[in-house]
Structures are given as structure tokens and as C-alpha cells.
Design a protein with these regions (language model features):
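Loop-to-helix entry region at the N-terminal start of transmembrane alpha-helices
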Residues: 31, 35-39, 84, 88-123, ...
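Short helix-to-coil transition segments within interhelical loops
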Residues: 132-162, 202
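C-terminal transmembrane helix and the adjacent membrane-cytosol boundary/short C-terminal tail
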Residues: 57-63, 209-240
């Protein structure tokens, strides 16, 4: 048989000492951890693209925008407000029929992606809108006077100038999405949230709950640190 590397063995020994109940379910824990990041990765990528699109759309179609269209702005604005006002746990239940129709299942990782996207996109859209709205209008007007079209203004002015702030709001959204994935676990999506409930709280294994909390805190700390580092780099030296 293939011998496992010493870091893995050392980690498992440490877990056995500080969290014996978790050690007994270690395989399930690692599977749940992987499921959480699968949900985070897939839903996050979709939400990033869709949220960025709608955030840009709101900025360019608002009153005084480069492509003012109040009808489009109001429709998108209302839809975003409606979905932002729905608590995520209610949104999960509300979207069950749509999730089944689209992906064929409302449970498991596959069934969690769509609700996570619906729960994240409105929040991220607003964050992007605020970030882009902070771009100096003088630079926008200067680019327009030089003949830049709508796409040129979007990519060369709005998105380029707002890179540091976009990184910050993306970091905030990513951290929020981690929280949503744990909530999704409460209704059968799997992941760390489901593991903490089923193997921790329901079986009165507090050490399992404690380790899950610590793991999530570490993940959040890493995301925040990376986001801060990238934002500082783009602000001070320019990543692009």
C-alpha cells in the first residue's frame, strides 16, 4: 500500500488529540470540506460574472450614465432589490422547484449552486455598482471627449479605475458566500455546515462544531488577507 506523507499523518494525530470525535469522522470531514469549496468555486464564478455584468449595467443605464436607459435601470434595480430582501434560507426553499427543473435535483452540491447564485448576485451587483459609481466622472468625460465608445468607457475607465475597490467588494462577497454555503448545508446541500449539524450538534459532539468554526475562520482570514494584499498592490503600484 502507499504510505501517506508525514504532514498528513501528523495532522491526523493532532486532530485525534484535540478532537477525537472529529477524527472518527475524518473522511467525512474532508469530503464535506471539498463539497463546500466546490459550491464556493462554482457559485462564486457564476455570481462574479453575472453580478459584474448587472453592476456595470446599472451604472451605465442610470440617470446621467453613458448609455442612459431608465426603463432598463428600473427593471434591474427592482429585481435586485426584491431578491436582496429575501432571507437566504427562505430563498433556498422558494427556488426548490426551479432548481429541480434546471439541474434535476434540489439537494446536494448540484442542487445548491443555483440558490447560491441567486443569493449572491444581488449583493455583489450592489457592491459593484457602488464601486463603479465612485470612479471620477472627470475621467469618464475626458475619455468620451477623446472618442471612446461605451465598451471603451466600461473597460478602460470604469473597470480599470475601480480595480482596487472591485477587489475589496469581491473579497467581501466571497466571505459572504462562504457563509451562505454553510447555510445551504442545513437543507441538504452538504458541506461543512451540514457536517457540523449532523455530526456535531445532532450527536452532541462539540469538538466537531468547534473545529468546523475554526476552519471557517481560517478560510475567511485567508480570503480577507489575499483581498487586502491585492487591493493594496493595485492601489499603490498598479497590477494592471
Amino acid at each position: 500500500c502507499i504510505r501517506r506523507s508525514w504532514p498528513i499523518e501528523a495532522f491526523e494525530t493532532l486532530i485525534d488529540l484535540i478532537a477525537p470525535n472529529l477524527y472518527a469522522y475524518r473522511d467525512r470531514f474532508f469530503t464535506s470540506f471539498a463539497a463546500t469549496f466546490e459550491m464556493f468555486g462554482k457559485a462564486g464564478l457564476i455570481a462574479f460574472v453575472v453580478g459584474l455584468f448587472f453592476g456595470v449595467l446599472l451604472v451605465v443605464t442610470r440617470k446621467g450614465g453613458v448609455r442612459e436607459n431608465l426603463l432598463v435601470y428600473q427593471v434591474v434595480n427592482i429585481v435586485i432589490n426584491v431578491f436582496r430582501s429575501i432571507p437566504f434560507i427562505i430563498l433556498l426553499i422558494f427556488l426548490i422547484p426551479l432548481t429541480r427543473a434546471v439541474v434535476g435535483s434540489a439537494i446536494g452540491v448540484k442542487g445548491a449552486i443555483l440558490p447560491l447564485v441567486f443569493g449572491t448576485v444581488p449583493f455583489y451587483t450592489r457592491q459593484v455598482e457602488v464601486a463603479l459609481a465612485g470612479v471620477n466622472e472627470g475621467k469618464v468625460e475626458a475619455a468620451r471627449s477623446m472618442g471612446s465608445g461605451t465598451l471603451g468607457l466600461i473597460f478602460r475607465v470604469y473597470l480599470h479605475e475601480a480595480v482596487p475597490e472591485l477587489i475589496r467588494v469581491t473579497t467581501v462577497t466571497a466571505i459572504s458566500l462562504i457563509g451562505l454555503t454553510t447555510m445551504a448545508g442545513a437543507v441538504g446541500a452538504g458541506g461543512i455546515g451540514s457536517f457540523a449539524i449532523n455530526y456535531g450538534q445532532n450527536q452532541n459532539h462539540q469538538d466537531i462544531v468547534n473545529v468546523c468554526v475554526v476552519v471557517l475562520l481560517i478560510v475567511v482570514f485567508i480570503l480577507q488577507s489575499l483581498g487586502n494584499a491585492l487591493a493594496r498592490r493595485t492601489t499603490n503600484r498598479g497590477l494592471f
